[in-house]
Amino acid sequence: MLDIRLFRNEPEKVKSKIELRGDDPKVVDQVLELDEQRRELISKTEEMKAKRNKVSEEIAQKKRNKEDADDVIAEMRHLGDEIKDIDNQLNEVDNKIRDILIRIPNLINEDVPQGASDEENVEVKKWGTPRDFEFEPKAHWDLVEELKMADFERAAKVSGARFVYLTKDGALLERALMNYMLTKHTTQHGYTEMMTPQLVNADTMFGTGQLPKFEEDLFKVEKEGLYTIPTAEVPLTNFYRDEIIQPGVLPELFTAQTACFRSEAGSAGRDTRGLIRLHQFDKVEMVRIVQPEDSWDALEEMTQNAEAILEELGLPYRRVILCTGDIGFSASKTYDLEVWLPSYNDYKEISSCSNCTDFQARRANIRFKRDAASKPELVHTLNGSGLAVGRTFAAIVENYQNEDGTLTIPEALVPFMGGKTKIEKPIK
């Protein structure tokens, strides 16, 4: 959520930033108009309360003098009714302002490229060379079924479209990837591992920006009023919600592996086969909570943490900066890492790393103190995939397949696969 002082002090800047996202800048004028009404009502109620205090003193004086105070008491009641009416109006205006503010996205950083869609994202780095196959490579959705690593048909029977059973070596590979990523982040990148709730309340979803604007993308347990998490970013970032972090604690670096649940509203017809776009998938998430002056360096470091995994796994990828028309609601700047998938003959997103500046912190009321005597300030929050496990699984299957239908295990994963170096079709 944005600070209303930005609207008062720099309205044109806010308008231009909103317009860059393709949204209507008129909301700035709406906020300012309501803010002016709010100020007038506050002034009016303060005036009325001062008058009520004066009348209260007058009543006390009359009673001390044993004079008739009925007319003054009547005036006091009238003032009380007027104050109550103004307070109700003020509450209504406050709610209108908040309802607008919570739907306005974060302000985009100056170096984010302008563009209308993902086609205008800007590549800033490329690593590795896509493999030149001497045979026709298979798509991961075909190869995993041949190797008995996954069963999409039975998952559809049990749950519907966009679900999967991972079986035998498929389950082993998924677990190996999760353990490898968590080990890398905790032993080499300085993150603290967390195991988080995977059902959260509405306040938590509001804090990270999923609610109210993106409720259709979420799965909800209606009876309890809880939501399944779309990413571990949600519980990790909200760890300090409504708290003041004490001096010396920051920066906090959290990582967690969770199942993630997404309705994929608006994705009909896209990536309907395989592991790329499921309703339920595993992901290892990175979250950083830092002091404001450290957040831009933290974004670079976090992105490099995700890149280190792709490089150690030997998976070709590229880094792109998301343009103004593709960047997420809560982000001020986002890097996407896209891994090479032969079945698409293209790069597909495998990680998204964002600096949300103080946008989520204001929504979730997360503050810190620099020292014991200082005033609390809003933190900056960052999040990134480190990595999406299912998409990494798919990338390994496609990039490490062999002509005889077997699958070579990347060297970095062998210790996490119980020493297994190759996956072959099981006898039964």
Swiss-Prot record:
It is found in: Cytoplasm. It is an enzyme of class 6 (ligase). ATP binds at residues 262-264, 349-352. One of its GO terms (molecular function) is serine-tRNA ligase activity. Keywords: Aminoacyl-tRNA synthetase, ATP-binding, Cytoplasm, Ligase, Nucleotide-binding, Protein biosynthesis. GO terms for cellular component: cytoplasm. Pathway: Aminoacyl-tRNA biosynthesis; selenocysteinyl-tRNA(Sec) biosynthesis; L-seryl-tRNA(Sec) from L-serine and tRNA(Sec): step 1/1. Pfam families: Seryl_tRNA_N, tRNA-synt_2b. PANTHER family: SERINE--TRNA LIGASE, SERYL-TRNA SYNTHETASE. Belongs to the class-II aminoacyl-tRNA synthetase family. Type-1 seryl-tRNA synthetase subfamily. Consists of two distinct domains, a catalytic core and a N-terminal extension that is involved in tRNA binding. This is Serine--tRNA ligase.
